[in-house]
């Protein structure tokens, strides 16, 4: 059984695809998501083998969602799009699976045959954005899209990944690895990433240092990262 997730902001498109997939005996639809934040949470929690992903979604596009996923746990992606010459060309150049809206039954059947033969995730990072402009976050039952320039630092603990921004603290499903690779945030501690632009002061301590951010928060700096952090500002 192949577990799959459908991600599309259009309800009719999701239901139409789900109806077609429900006729396949070896496909189990584990969920449907209407936006990238819901999709990131579901992919992280449920770990579907296959994701049908609409690339033209508001605020955070399907391509941006790809950039947010950890390459080590990436599912097989089938892109879904209204005709977009440049996107289709990119998909063809890299031999990625894609479906054009409205989805043709024969095309879907051929795509599923290829997927059944090979569930190995593609190197979709080749066409994903190199950096993130927004972070998908949540606060209680509210989903939030935080501009990366509003983020002062992020940190991890047993309850997850926390984002400290100009409007308070929220949570994200993004990993520290993805955040370090796709944003201007840099390591200052094993459990912390910080925006250099948010640093107001660095106080040197016997055990490392402590940063005071522009909003007045205190962030630890371990000895391991102190030198590289100082060098960002021209200190030796």
From Swiss-Prot:
Residues 3-116 form the Response regulatory domain. It comes from Shewanella oneidensis (strain ATCC 700550 / JCM 31522 / CIP 106686 / LMG 19005 / NCIMB 14063 / MR-1). InterPro entries: CheY-like_superfamily, LytTR_DNA-bd_dom, Sig_transdc_resp-reg_receiver, WalR-like. Residues 135-235 form the HTH LytTR-type domain. The modification 4-aspartylphosphate is found at residue 54. CDD domains: REC_LytTR_AlgR-like. It comes from the Bacteria. This is Uncharacterized response regulatory protein SO_2823. It holds the Pfam family Response_reg. Coiled coil: none annotated. The keyword Glycosyltransferase does not apply. GO terms for biological process: regulation of DNA-templated transcription. Keywords: DNA-binding, Phosphoprotein, Transcription, Transcription regulation, Two-component regulatory system.
